[in-house]
Amino acid sequence: MEQPKYKRVVLKLSGEALAGKQGFGIQPAVIQSIAKQVKEVVELGVEVAIVVGGGNIWRGKTGSEMGMDRATADYMGMLATVMNALALQDSLEQLGVETRVQTSIEMRQVAEPYIRRRAIRHLEKKRVVIFAAGTGNPYFSTDTTAALRAAEIEADVILMAKNNVDGVYSADPNVDANAVKYDELSYLDVIKQGLGVMDSTASSLCMDNNIPLIVFSIMEEGNIKRAVLGENIGTIVRGK
């Protein structure tokens, strides 16, 4: 059996990753593909926690740019992440993968409230835990949620799955043909150069807690497993 490099991981899925090429909403084929990839990793004995974004349904930033109260717009974004989390839970459980959704905002009829010790216990029992509703606070991104939860549950790595790029580039490769892909970066490089991997709050949290980050494409099947096995895919960000 292949030996994974990481024992406990946080998989960060953007809302856009769940929308696939249609760019909006939840695309069933995409979410099923992601669920299959997660199952492969669980079968290696790896403990998997997932943080989902909500940008495929609603973006708080967009709402505030339209003149909406920023906090209200962000709370709407948090609710969007819960919808994504429930859809992903359903896909995983259809494949026989035990899954729990924990939300930072209490909604006991649909999910457990986020309790750190309970989340860790689920992971130890090889259940997948999906963290939804961000940090529960406006003004914080789901990237920051991933960094925070990774620190709390003592994850070995954050796997940042992208649907439009296969790593970190010097510029947007979809726009600039001369963009250079990086194999490895430090968090200070990311912050100083404004590379847009994750926001500065999330980057600082990862740097201060020494949590490595792997940025890779979710669109190629099997990439989550490859990342967990330590294969060189995408870009690794670590250290100062």
From Swiss-Prot:
The protein's name: Uridylate kinase
Q: How does it assemble?
A: Homohexamer.
Q: Which family does it belong to?
A: Belongs to the UMP kinase family.
The free-text function statement in the UniProt record for this protein reads: Catalyzes the reversible phosphorylation of UMP to UDP.
Q: Where is this region: Involved in allosteric activation by GTP?
A: 20-25
Recorded hits in InterPro entries, A to Z, give:
AceGlu_kinase-like_sf, Asp/Glu/Uridylate_kinase, Uridylate_kinase, Uridylate_kinase_bac
| Top EC category | transferase
